[in-house]
Amino acid sequence: MKIILSLIICSQLANTCLDPYTWPEKFDSQYECLTFGYEESLNKMKEIGREEVNEYIVFIKFTCEPVTSAWN
């Protein structure tokens, strides 16, 4: 079974989230998807930067979901 990763960047200050970004590659396991999701979330936080993260109270959430037939 393949797993898809979707990252969602949110601002607690604005009480809103951007549309989910679905990672183009599929993962072979839940573990691979989750560890990659945590790594990419950290990379994105560093890219956004301390100042903007603190100013807009940014947080990132993600999901790892099994691929449905529509994604095959």
Question: In which residue ranges do the predicted regions lie?
Answer:
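A short, exposed loop/beta-hairpin motif centered on an aromatic-Gly-Thr core
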Residues: 18-32
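Short, well-ordered alpha-helical segments
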Residues: 29, 34-41
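Short, mixed-charge low-complexity intrinsically disordered segments
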Residues: 43-72
